[in-house]
Structure formats: structure tokens, C-alpha cells
């Protein structure tokens, strides 16, 4: 598994301006685990919101096929998380590995489902009413 730095990602770059740290704990024992995460500062939160707002117009212009690719890529990355990830989450939550693996699969499955909706265009809500000349009392044309 990749080294856990505990930094925030803002606009595609790491940021760790905060001075407060959140310590990862073993849920069963309360023992500190070797992972600390920098708590974002109010300025970092603002910067993250601004970065998201400025990325939105570009993302909105992407064709549905590219958005579907994006969701499929996230799903693949989630599925690629190995047993080390599952073990850490089990310690932090006191949940069994099967639950964590199930949640991971459910999440990646939902991302793939939404990707398929994008590919099919279901979100447009388009309906095609075929002509029915035999329809009574009036034909649909």
C-alpha cells in the first residue's frame, strides 16, 4: 500500500498547512495507530471549495463518456486497494474484513452503475413514443 502522508488534496496538490493533527486509533483498544492526518485550516477548506468551483465548468463540458471513464477509474482504484487497506480499516472501525470488503465492492459497483447510466444516457430522461395507428379512440402518430 502507498505510504500514508496524512495530507489534504486541494486542486490536485498536497496541502498540510494545519497545525492540528487527527490521530488514527484502534477502535477496540484505543491504541494510537501510526497514522496522523493534518486537519485542514479554514483557508484550506476555502481553497478546496474554490478549486472545486473552478473545476466544475470544465468537468461539466466533458462528454458523458469521459465522465463514465472517470467513475470507472475511481471504481478500479477502490477495487485495487489491497489487504493492508482492509486491515487498517478493520482496526480503525472494529468491523470485520468481510464487511469492509463488501462496502468497498458496493461502492465501486455503484460507481460503475452510474458510469453505465452516463453511457446509456438515461439521465436525459428521453422517452420515445412509437406511433400506434391502431390506438383508440385516436391513433398516436
Predicted regions, residues:
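Donor nucleotide-activated moiety binding/catalytic core segment of transferases
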Residues: 139-141
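N-terminal Rossmann-like NAD(P)+-binding subdomain of aldehyde/semialdehyde dehydrogenases
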Residues: 1-137
Amino acid at each position: 500500500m502507498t505510504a500514508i502522508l496524512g495530507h489534504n488534496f486541494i486542486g490536485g496538490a498536497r496541502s498540510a498547512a494545519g497545525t492540528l493533527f487527527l490521530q488514527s486509533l484502534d477502535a477496540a483498544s484505543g491504541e494510537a495507530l501510526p497514522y496522523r492526518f493534518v486537519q485542514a485550516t479554514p483557508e484550506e477548506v476555502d481553497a478546496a471549495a474554490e478549486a472545486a468551483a473552478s473545476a466544475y465548468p470544465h468537468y461539466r463540458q466533458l462528454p458523458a463518456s469521459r465522465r463514465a471513464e472517470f467513475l470507472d477509474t475511481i471504481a478500479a482504484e477502490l477495487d485495487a486497494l489491497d489487504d493492508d487497506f482492509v486491515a487498517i480499516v478493520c482496526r480503525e472501525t472494529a468491523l470485520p474484513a468481510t464487511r469492509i470488503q463488501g462496502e468497498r465492492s458496493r461502492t465501486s459497483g455503484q460507481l460503475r452503475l452510474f458510469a453505465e447510466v452516463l453511457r446509456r444516457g438515461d439521465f436525459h430522461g428521453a422517452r420515445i413514443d412509437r406511433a400506434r395507428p391502431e390506438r383508440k379512440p385516436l391513433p398516436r402518430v
